[in-house]
Amino acid sequence: MGFWNSLFGGETNPEEEKRAADERNFDLLKYDGVKAMRIGQYEYAVKCFEKALETKEDAEVRDYLSRAFIRMGRLDDALAELKMLTVQEPDNIHLKMQAAGVAYMKEDYEEMIAICEQALDVDADNAMVHLFYAKAELGQENLIQGIARLTKAIALDENLADARLLRGQTLLKMGDFNAATEDVAWLTEHAEESEDVLLLHARIEAAKGNADEAIRIYSHVIDINPFQVDAFRERGKLRMEQGDKQGAEEDMKMVLELNPEEMADVNGEYSAEGIEQKTRQAYSNLNPFGI
């Protein structure tokens, strides 16, 4: 209609013109915001998204805004945006898990549990929700409840490898090495090889007193990823306990190279005497479960 009016010289509708202009501005702001996010200009992206939302409500733009906030470390703001989206789409489990993930990053486990409870009201048999609920329980050091939630998640989805890994890590922390070994065995057989699974396996073997096997697994991790600080650190502890002072010192030197802040109290060059003393000190303070 506006086209024909302009073509034949008729009157235009100011409201329609404003609506069309707002729509164009919204699209431009959304496009500029997405483009800015892709090149890491998150502050500008936030300005674009917030301005676009002043024009009209849009779930996609609000989701983009939450992601930009996360990139900037503004987790409170990100969570607020995601919670607004969950109100708009109360049955959207994925959005609730996004919000729970941000709460987890904030270490706000009460908020995380509240979100998971809302998600379970929508789908009580969602394995991923039970996994997130377990993470919140474990964050509060409720190990028994966390194990129960993880077991529930695995019962609902036996292929949920993240739940088995977390359960294995928690069982190790609780000293139940045999049960932890069962989770590692399943992961080794059914899941793709990963550093986390191998590290868990090595830690279990070390806790059982199988130092040689643990060292072998740590060495395999290092072969896969020569920058795996935990593997060097924990292998070095075992080498020290076995009397392999040279091997332990070599591992500690690698730890210091890869993570200079690890031993911020080391002064001067790494003399033979100094590195030995610091190595013994570091390994004596090391948690045997890598926790």
Kindly give the residue locations of the regions a language model identified.
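Structural signature of tandem alpha-helical TPR/SEL1-like repeats
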Residues: G40-K47, M72-M84, K106-Q118, Q140-K152, ...
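Alpha-helical segment of the N-proximal tetratricopeptide repeat
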Residues: R19-E60, Y64-R71, N92-H94, Q98-E107, ...
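Structural marker of alpha-solenoid helical repeat scaffolds
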Residues: A21, E54-T55, Q88-E89, V122, ...
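Helix-start (N-cap) detector for alpha-helical repeat units in TPR-like alpha-solenoids
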Residues: F26, A59-E60, I93-H94, Y109, ...
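Alpha-helical adaptor scaffolds
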Residues: M97, G101, K135, L165, ...
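Canonical tetratricopeptide repeat
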Residues: Y64, Q98, F132, L166, ...
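TPR/TPR-like alpha-solenoid repeats
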Residues: A68, V102, A136, T170, ...
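Terminal, low-structured helical/coil segments at or just beyond the last alpha-helical repeat
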Residues: M1-E17, G247-I291
